[in-house]
């Protein structure tokens, strides 16, 4: 399985923010933002900080992509 952060990227567009703004607002490292851009897993703490700052739920930011067998 893979993870998609497309919901988060859409939220950023709606809030007129970019990834650099997100990193600064949530105190995230560039490496964490890069991992998310590549669809890699990040910690629940990171998702919690983002959700709290942007006032959104996990499901609004992240979706699971099921891969074929």
Where do the language-model regions lie?
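A short, Lys/Arg-rich alpha-helix, primarily the initiator
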Residues: 1-18
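The alpha-helix within a helix-turn-helix
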Residues: 12, 23, 51
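Key DNA-contact positions within bacterial/archaeal DNA-binding proteins
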Residues: 20, 31, 59
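Recognition helix of helix-turn-helix/homeodomain-like DNA-binding domains
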Residues: 28-41
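Short, basic-rich loop-to-helix N-cap that marks the start of a DNA-contacting helix
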Residues: 39-52
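Short C-terminal boundary/hinge segments that cap the last helix of small helical domains
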Residues: 55-69
């Amino acid at each position: 399985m893979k993870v998609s952060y497309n919901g988060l990227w859409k939220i950023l567009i709606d809030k007129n923010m970019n990834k650099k703004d997100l990193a600064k607002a949530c105190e995230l490292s560039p490496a964490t933002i890069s991992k998310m851009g590549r669809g890699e897993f990040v910690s629940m703490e990171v998702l919690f900080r983002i959700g709290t700052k942007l006032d959104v739920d996990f499901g609004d930011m992240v979706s699971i992509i099921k891969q074929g067998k």
